[in-house]
Amino acid sequence: MKKYFDFSHFKFDLLGGLTAGIVALPLALAFGEQSGLGAASGLYGAAFISFFAALFGGTNTQISGPTAPMTALSMVIIAGIVQACEGDISVALPMILAVFVLAGLIQVLMGFLSLGSYIKFIPYPVVSGFMTGIGVIILITQIPPTLGYNSGQDEQLIEHFMPHGEELILDRILSEEAEEGIMVLDDFKETVLRASAITEIQKMDEAKVLASNAGKGVLGSLRYIERALLNVNWMELVLALLTILIIYGFKRITTAVPSTLVALVVVSSGAYFGGLDYRLIQEIPMGMPKFNYEIFTGIDFKIMSPFILSAFTLAMLGAIDSLLTSLVADNMTKTQHKPNQELIGQGIGNTIAAFFGGLPGAGATIRTVVNINSGGKTRLSGMMAGVFLFSIILVLGTIASKIPAGVLAGILITVGIGVMDYRGLKALPKMEWSEKIILLTVLILTVFWQLVFAVAVGLVMAA
């Protein structure tokens, strides 16, 4: 135990962990909001993964939590399961979290099977195309919220989906009664009565869900970009642009304080205390998140089975993301990480986070670099980052719920710009034709088809 925990650098670990936790806070909120599960899910993921991946992992200075690639893939999985559940997030949630749990367990298994050492052999064009594709996805999907547009609040679009909404309600009534055996002629009156009792409010609620789902993802964002431009909410746009301006501008003044945090605090405070009319992020409950027992009881395997492959992809992506960051940490600290132990730690962190409703994550490069530069030296630094984020959940959930959605959209725009692999794009003219084709194919498939299959196709092409 003495070797496992080294308290001789505790002062430095505390400072490094707190600083990394501060950097992680706005990103966690933004990734949670982007995913579709709400800002709280990002915060829960950041806290649990940071603590447990550090406790059980194999990279002493690694700071883990939701990352851009993991969130982009999670967003696709969440949207797919919600759509399969006819837009009912309460029905979909146990299956979404079950996929996240499965991904974590796969990572643990990968660690025990000593597969961590082989991740580094993935060809660079595949990784480059995928990372740039992730950046493009984030940029495209954040255009509507930056403009203050939400398809689920577009009255004309909701009106358009009203007939379809009524059809879905009728389908559910018929399905329920077929299961109950109420399809004989004598009992058919009950079906007619239930159908005639459908209210306009019920139709409206169903149409809102349909409109909201139609605007999600890359294709949904592109489909309604014209409507977004015609219905710009100037307040949201100003808040997003001001956030972007501060993030890039404050870095020129000093890097001692994270510019993302400065933007979050300054713009959110100005909007709140200025009494501005802005759209809030989803509410963040104060107190410890509840354990989701529904993962064991609320699973429909017919709906979930197509997403099992997604769990493998999520596990593989998290492994790549984490171990690449581990290499960065090694170069900075002149140490050697343990790749298989790191996968076990990441898997445990993701599994526990999922049981409490958190987004999956991985080793985060920027947060890890900040931790090292701020003095972090041992696994205690990552655990301290997790403790800091837990304190935010316990004490400041209500305050964090006042953050404008436009601010998080602005933060995500800068994340999308930052995650793209410009080195790979600049090297394209000098690459061999085979590498160019692989990089561009993975990039296009990542953005417009399926993240789940993009890397697999790239690996097959590179073989």
Language model features by range: what are they?
Residues M1-A463:
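Transmembrane helical cores of multi-pass ion-transport proteins
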